[in-house]
Structure formats: C-alpha cells, structure tokens
Design a protein with these regions (language model features):
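Gly/Pro-rich hinge or "lid" segments in bacterial periplasmic/extracellular proteins
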Residues: 99, 193-258, 262, 272, ...
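N-terminal lobe/hinge region of extracytoplasmic solute-binding protein
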Residues: 65-116, 147, 223-225
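Detector for C-terminal structural segments
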Residues: 42, 46, 313, 341-375, ...
Length: 676
C-alpha cells in the first residue's frame, strides 16, 4: 500500500513540475500543445476525407417554370400540351421507358419476350409494384388502359397507336400483345403510361375527359406509379387559374427512389414573366424550344443543356397541288435549284444561334448513327442560277425575277384531209373556223352554218378561203384557183389562224405557307431572300397552327410549306413518305409517291433486325434525296436551363421535351459524405 501511495505521489509531483513549467514557459508550452492539437485534428480530417466521398443526399425542392396551363394530367388524353406531358412523365409509369441515352428499357416490366417473328409480345410485370394509393399494379391495369385507348367512345389522341393490337391477360402479372403484322416500332408503343383500373373503371367515356380536367380529380384521384406523386395545388378560386402544382417523392417507388423531396411546377401565361423569375432565382428550371428569349438569360448563372431530339424543319413542295395553285414546283430541276440556293448555315446561325444541326436527310443520320446520304445540296448560288438558265428561266433586270416563255400546242388541230361529202367533228371545227370574222366571216362563209357536213356551201367557202390566202395555200403549188378540198397547205393555214400554239410567259414565283411563330418567321425571311438572290419571287403566308392543320395541311392546299416533323426512338418515316399516307389523316403532306421507296419503307417497318432496318432506311434516303421533293433545313436542339444548385442531370438524347426528366431520380441538391 505504501508503495502505491509513493508511486501516486511521484506522478503528482511530476505533473506539478509540468504545470510549473507551463507557468514558467506559459507561451511556448501553449503553442506546443496547440500545435499538437492542430496536427492531430488535421490528420483526422485528412483521413476522413481520404476514406469518405461526397454523394447525393436526400432533400431539396426543385421548381420548374412552365408556359401555359395543364389541362388533362392523364395518359389517356395526353396531347401536345407540354404542361400535361411533363406532369404525366413524373406521375405515371409505362411497361417500358426511355433511359438517358434515348434507349428503351424496362419500367414496370420485369421481362419482355418477342415471339412469332415479331407478332407476339409477352410481358411479365415486376413483383411488388404499387400505385401511389397503395393498391397493387396488376395485368388488369394494363389491359384496362389499352382497352380505354382503343375504345372510340373515349376519343383518346393515343388511339391510333393501338389500332389492330389485341391484348390478353395471361396471369395477374403477365400480358400478351398480338400484332397482325410485325412492326419494329411497337416497342415504343409499350412506353405508354398505365392508369389505375380501380380509379377509373366506373367513370363513363363521356364523363372521363371532364373529370380529368376537374380539381376533384387532381386533388383526389391523380394516382400514378411514377417517382413522384401529387401533393398540392395552388389555384385561383375565382378564375380557376392554376398557379402551381407540387409533387412529392414517392417513397414506395419500385425503382431507384429520387433524392429530391419535391418538384413544383410554376405556371406562367407570359414568357417574359417566366424568364424574369428564372433570372431572379425564383424558379430552378425552364425549357426553351428554340433560341427565342435566350439573349435575355445570363447563361453563366445556369447549367445549360442542349438536348438533341429527332425533329426537323423542312420546306415541303406539293407534288400534286390543287388546280388553283401553281405547278411550277413539280419541276425537279426547279426544286434542285431552290435547294442549292438555300444557305442553311445562315439559317442555323441567325435563327437558333447555332444551337442545333444542319440536316440533309429524312432519317437524321447524325441522331441515329446512320450513314449520311451520298448526295448533299450544299449552298451554291452559281449552280442554282445555272440550273434555272438551262431550264429557260431568264433574269429580267427590271423586276429581278426570272421568267420563261412556253409554247403550248392547241387542244385541237386539223391533222387529216377533208373533202366534199365528209361528215365528222373535224368538219364542224372547219365550219366554225371559216365563219370566224378574223379568218373568213361573211365574205368567205356567208351562211356560217355549223352542221358537221361538208356540202356545197362548205366547199365554196373553202375555195374562197384558199384564194384569200393564196400566197400561203395555192402559190406553193402554182395554183390560182381554189380546189375546195382541205389538204396540207390549207390545213396548215387553218391551224395557224384558228388553232395557233399558245405562247405563255411563266414567272418563277410561288407561295410559302408556315406557322405564325417567330422561329418560322425568321427562317422564312431568310429563305425568301436566298431565293430572291437567284431571281425567284416568293410570297410568304403565315397561319395559326390550328388554321394550318385544318385548312392547309389536311386538304393539302399549298404550293410550298415550311413545317416540322418528329420521328421516334426507332425511326419510322413510313407515315411521312409512304404513298398510302397521301390523304388525311396520313402525314405524307406533299403527295409524294415512289414505288421503290414504298417497298423499302414497308420492309424497314417490318424488320426487327436493326442492321437490316438501317440498310433499308439508308436506301430509302438515297431515293428520296434523288427525287428532291423537299429541302431539309435543320434540327434544333431544346435548350434547358437549370439552377447551378441542381446536380445529376445526364440526359444525352430525348424523344420529346418531357423526357428531360428521364433520370430525375438522380437529380440532387443536397450532398453528404459516406465511407468508401
């Protein structure tokens, strides 16, 4: 015991000596201790940083600015309304979906089998997948959704995608789709969003669209299975204007759960107001479909994404215009000259600030990875002028517009000899001609009777006609008196006087119709100047999209049309160029017809082999460009601005604007550190 006490005493004594030292050398000791603490802390921090990593954390609210109002937030009545499509993309799921590379992958589907040479698709659903209200998703929901889309009483805009498709429930988690013929694009149809049967099965077709647009539906039955679910709506009670809709994370989502806690959609009626709120940081994201308005945004403050999608703008030349329209564009050489005269680089730079690509083909080789066409119409003003000169269109200095003279044969001419006692339609025309005061009149054919019979009166009139024009009719044969028979020289003079060839002056001009929106206005003005530079006069007409669709496109009532077309994930130009689609509701806008092109389009559509389909489409591309029925211009990018606080956005290609949310589950605002 004494030894222990002695030992403790010695320890206390040494500690006391240390304290005395610290008092004696207070400052030096303080800094030594502080240095040791700093070193140890730094080592700890270094080791922590070395052995941990920053990863996305849960939480954060993302605010998206939307121009316009939602109308039908449901896949059944999904239209071109961007607000509806954006919300549906986050609230609902399909059997298949697009990933960030634009590829089609499984969504609700666990497995997909394609059987019977592409005529049968069998899908097995994932286990334990649920609606936002907790009800399980089964094959019944899939069958119900497709039946609703196919039922004409519901009048769904999506119905055309499901014509001729038979769906059958095999088990609670297996369904089969049977096609009449193999169709490679059907895989894309399987991205259709599925709706819950238990919510909508008791609502009649007449009531359903009205219910979808009601506040009751949004607050009570806006049930999907997507990564986000409905939380609240902010709506003006007096006007019904929806100010915002907020979605919250679906914690029971069957796939990877989002990091963001909420996504709010803020709705604006004017783009200027939206852009102001974006610049002030009141909203975190806004999608601009063209370069319009970009100059008002400080790009340095945002993440700026140029999103590629398979849409393109072209000038379409009607190959079979209405009778009251000019047919000048049915000339392949004229179309070729117009093509060479277009400065596509100027259009790209001045209309969309180079945010897009120049295109030369209907199958967008740069987007889909196809081979480019062998022939490209690069800007060449001199070549365009040379083609028009060779076509007979001469430049008129006074007007700056090209014209050419065309000699058209008369619809009738005397081609056979006529003589006494003949009876036929040629005699009828002969009598009319002789009775014409400018040719003969009373001095030659006093009675002027038109009977179709070559009698004495007619014979005498022919004699007088021959003698009146004896220098041309009789003199070449050394005759002084008429013969009364209509032969070579007489026929020639009759044709010259009564049925001359018609000389027509054709002015190189046509009308171009397009949409009354700024981008199309700017493009059309450049086109007009490009064509004016080679002596072509163009009248530009602007129409609203509704008027354009109903009065212009549907009846094919135009000469030239500046418009856009959108392809899908699996490029299928069939609707736009196959001859079977020439009449509305087909989308062959210009009445294009080529049997070889038709065959290639049919083969490409039926092929499930990617390489073979590519070969068919590339062959079709060559034929179409050779026929030159349109001028391919550009493929604009979508410009997506997001706040720099948002991370994780990695979308490369999208099929439509709403697909910018494809990898939304990877977006994050907050971060945390975890051990490696």
């Amino acid at each position: 015991m004494k030894k222990i006490l002695k030992k403790e005493y010695l320890i206390l004594k040494k500690w006391g000596q240390f304290l005395n030292c610290f008092k004696k050398f207070q400052k030096p000791c303080y800094f030594i201790v502080l240095g040791i603490i700093i070193i140890l802390t730094s080592i700890g921090i270094f080791l922590y940083i070395q052995n941990t990593e920053i990863v996305p954390g849960d939480g954060g609210n993302f605010k998206e600015g939307i121009l316009g109002q939602p109308r039908f937030i449901n896949p059944v009545y999904l239209s071109n309304n961007d607000a509806d499509r954006d919300l549906v993309e986050l609230l609902f799921s399909g059997l298949m979906k697009y990933n960030e590379k634009g590829e089609i992958v499984n969504d609700l589907a666990e497995n997909l089998e394609i059987k019977e040479d592409g005529k049968l698709y069998e899908i097995k659903l994932k286990e334990n997948i649920f609606w936002h209200d907790g009800e399980k998703i089964t094959s019944d929901d899939v069958v119900f959704t497709i039946n609703v889309l196919q039922n004409p009483e519901y009048k769904s805009p999506q119905a055309i995608r499901w014509l001729g498709i038979n769906i059958e429930k095999i088990t609670d988690n297996i369904v089969q789709f049977r096609l009449k013929t193999a169709y490679s694009g059907f895989l894309e149809s399987l991205t259709e969003k599925i709706v819950p049967k238990h919510i909508f099965e008791d609502i009649s077709p007449k009531e359903l669209p009205w219910y979808f647009s009601s506040r009751e539906y949004i607050q009570k039955d806006l049930i999907g299975s997507g990564p986000f679910k409905f939380k609240k709506i902010n709506q003006d009670n007096s006007t019904g204007y929806i100010k915002s809709i907020t979605l919250e994370k679906n914690k029971n989502y069957f796939a990877k759960k989002p990091f963001l806690s909420e996504i709010s959609f803020e709705f604006f009626s004017e783009e200027n107001d939206l852009l102001k709120n974006l610049s002030r940081g009141n909203i975190d994201g806004y999608l601009i479909s063209s370069s319009d308005g970009i100059e008002n945004i400080n790009e340095d403050k945002f993440n700026v994404f140029s999103l590629s999608l398979p849409r393109y703008f072209s000038v379409f030349f009607n190959q079979d215009p209405p009778e009251d329209k000019s047919d000048i564009l049915t000339s392949k050489n004229v179309r070729e000259a117009l093509n060479y005269a277009v400065d596509k680089q100027q259009i790209l730079k001045e209309t969309i600030s180079d945010k897009g690509k120049i295109i030369n083909s209907p199958i967008l080789p740069d987007f889909y990875g196809f081979n480019s066409p062998s022939e490209v119409y690069n800007f060449d003003k001199e070549k365009a002028e040379e083609i028009l000169e060779n076509e007979g269109f001469k430049y008129i200095d006074d007007t700056g517009i090209r014209k050419k003279s065309i000699s058209q044969k008369s619809t009738f001419s005397f081609n056979k000899n006529l003589a006494y006692k003949d009876t036929n339609s040629d005699v009828t025309e002969l009598q009319k001609c002789l009775a014409d005061p400018k040719v003969g009149g009373p001095d030659v054919y006093p009675s002027g009777k038109v009977t179709g019979y070559f009698g004495n009166e007619t014979k005498q009139a022919v004699i007088l006609f021959q003698e009146k024009y004896k220098e041309d009719v009789l003199a070449p044969y050394g005759l002084e008196k008429g013969t009364g028979s209509v032969r070579t020289s007489t026929r020639k003079k009759l044709n010259e006087l009564c049925f001359p060839n018609i000389e027509e002056t054709v002015t190189l001009e046509f009308s171009l119709i397009t949409i009354d929106k700024e981008l199309f206005t700017n493009i059309s003005e450049i086109l007009k100047q490009n064509w004016k530079d080679i002596g072509v006069n163009v009248e530009i007409k602007f129409e609203s999209i509704s008027t354009l669709e109903t009065d212009i496109i549907k009846p094919r009532n135009f000469e030239a049309l500046l418009f856009g077309e959108v392809l899908s994930f699996l490029p299928d130009p069939f609707p736009f160029w196959h001859s079977s689609q020439k009449e509305s509701p087909g989308l062959n806008l210009i009445n294009y017809e080529n049997k070889e092109a038709d065959k290639l389009l049919e083969q490409a559509r039926a092929s499930l082999d990617n390489q073979k389909r590519q070969e068919k489409l590339e062959a079709f591309q060559e034929i179409l460009i050779e026929d030159n029925p349109c001028i391919f211009l550009l493929r604009p990018d979508l410009i997506y601005f997001t706040s720099q606080k948002i991370n994780g956005q990695q979308v490369e290609k999208i099929i439509e604007p709403s697909k910018r949310f494809t990898n939304v589950e990877n977006w994050y605002i907050k971060t945390k550190r975890t051990w490696k």
